[in-house]
């Protein structure tokens, strides 16, 4: 079974934002939904899917797909971080972008493999 943790709360935690601090929730939700749309285009997750608050979980998006869970969580975290709070260092930004490209490749590869199989 995929993770039943709230998508919003896990991304906030990874961004270093306390779960009870809601000042940026609407901005973060918008960026999460943008990223989920990218994942939809890759063939990952349930389609169409978006979050409206803290109720939606990773299991809601991925179902029982444990294989993609950590890849997707890391991808969403990094993508939201790059939009919401980009690093000041160009070296860190480049490292994040390279990681995002690698994650995109891996996620698309898994989705293509499952389609063929």
Language-model region placement:
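Conserved short "hinge" loops at termini or chain/domain junctions
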Residues: 1-68, 105-117
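Short loop/turn elements at secondary-structure junctions
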Residues: 61-117
């Amino acid at each position: 079974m995929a993770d039943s943790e709230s998508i919003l709360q896990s991304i906030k935690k990874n961004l270093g934002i306390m779960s009870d601090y809601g000042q940026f929730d609407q901005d973060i939700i918008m960026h999460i939904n943008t990223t989920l749309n990218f994942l939809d285009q890759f063939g990952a997750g349930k389609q169409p899917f978006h979050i409206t608050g803290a109720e939606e979980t990773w299991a809601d998006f991925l179902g029982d797909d444990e294989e993609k869970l950590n890849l997707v969580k890391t991808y969403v975290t990094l993508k939201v971080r790059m939009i919401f709070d980009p690093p000041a260092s160009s070296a860190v930004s480049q490292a994040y972008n390279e990681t995002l490209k690698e994650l995109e490749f891996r996620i698309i590869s898994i989705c293509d493999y499952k389609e063929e199989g």
